Amino acid sequence: MKKRYFILFLCCVSWFTGRSAVTDSARIEHHATWKNWQKETAWQNPAIHGLSLTLPYSEVYVQMDYLHQSAPFVLQKGTGHFLSEAKAETFLRLSNHSSAWGAASYMTGKQYQVSWNSSSDYDLLNPYILADTLGGDTHCERYGFQGGYAVSKGKFQLGIEAIFRAEHEFRNVDPRMRGIVTDLTLRLGTAYDFGKYQWAAGLEGNVYKQTNDVDFYRELGVIPEFQMTGLGTEYSRFSGDKRTLYYKGGGYGINLDANPLNETGFYGHAKLWRRQYKRMLADLNSVPLTQLFYHSAEVSFGWKHMGGTRQVALDGNLVFVRRSGDENIIGKSSAQYYPITGKLTMYKNYLIDTYLRGLYGWGSGSGTWCLNGKIGYWSNRERYVYPERKMEAAKIYGRLGGQWMRSLSRTVALTVDMAAAYYGNVSSGIVMPYANMKASFQDMINHQYQFEKADYGMLSAKIRSDYRLSGSQIGLFAELGGDWITCSENEHQHHLHLALGITF
């Protein structure tokens, strides 16, 4: 019953906040590539995000997402998924000086043939996960909420935003993993108009928690669960039958932005953030086993012209992430107390993504088109200190995309997106103490390296049709998209996406 009420709530969120019928200009403002060029950078500041859009727009829709890989590119993520979601999104311009936006969603689905991972949020917590060699299909449920508000007074702008996620992932056959996640992010931003530029600063804070356990119900016995520590290593003292743990962490970040007030000129973005996550063993009085640290820096600088009917943008970007992991040295227990006698920084990981991207387009109130491209260098280096283990790969990549949006009549509009990309490996290497590794761990590491150093090619397409009901505030839309990825290891991935909904 709770799910039914929640889905009903999604369908009503935007209905009672809609103020005007959807126009072509509103559809373009919220979906055009060039209008959302800085969505992943400057729009992380809610003061910029809330006042960058001018027209009210809401969507309520259901969507389905299917992905299949002929062999898992990442064992810990499985061979694909089937997900269905109900979602409502709205943006309201409350006045010339204020705006509010929000979203609510419910997702459910299944992930296929997951192995070497019994924890949720693998991308975030890797390598400090609970894992076994058997695995299986996992089910998931996710609730998401987001809300923000921005206001301007004179030359000052202020914004605030909250993003919340609650997720439950589980398996109903042995090994019966379960992960329950709560994740809350708060953002506060401010901006000031000075000279020909808007100067902005923002703060971000995150709180994260996950409870994680694995159970066995069948009489055939149990298999060991490994407390993984990176590149095929485990904390052997606490592996085996210790299967209940939890993660606790979060962090903070700061971002700075400069944007031309007339939408023509140089712009820049910088962000620094730090996060950390503790893994604690609930079976042994919550003794902390490991701690994972993130330190990241993002820098972007470019020039744009977004005024009038022609749009041009070019920028250079650098993303650097350093991850390091501490393993606690735990003494002998005394009355269920496990003293920490020291710690060692054993795992190190360096990620670099630097790229140049550009856009050229044309737009008006009834239609728009644009071409966008991206070329870059990506590098991932991992190291485990002792016994020494190393894995690294570097790629050069390029992507070319295009978008066409047009009103075919007073009631029908069409949007088409297409893209092609290629990731080519330029260097790779691995160092492993294979003589001292279990056969199953060798196979897992070799599979990881095989797909990390592979070349990838991608083709994608998406088409969306909008129909505006005559004399009504409501519009209907249908969207169909997909992509095809080929891998130099003679494997492939296909992905399909379908969405149906209403706009107002």
Predicted feature descriptions by range:
Residues 86-92, 145-151, 186-192, 254-260, ...:
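Residues on the lipid-exposed face of transmembrane beta-strands in outer-membrane beta-barrel proteins
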Residues 54-60, 96-102, 154-160, 195-201, ...:
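Outer-envelope beta-barrel architecture signal
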Residues 70-77, 113-119, 170-178, 212-219, ...:
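Outer-membrane beta-barrel translocator domains and adjoining extracellular loop/strand segments
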Residues 20-112:
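N-terminal, post-signal peptide beta-strand-biased segments of exported outer-membrane/organellar beta-barrel
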Residues 64-70, 106-110, 151-155, 164-168, ...:
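Transmembrane beta-strands of outer-membrane beta-barrel pores
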Residues 233-373:
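Long, internal scaffold/assembly segments composed of regular secondary structure
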Residues 25-26, 492-504:
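Outer-membrane beta-barrel "beta-signal"
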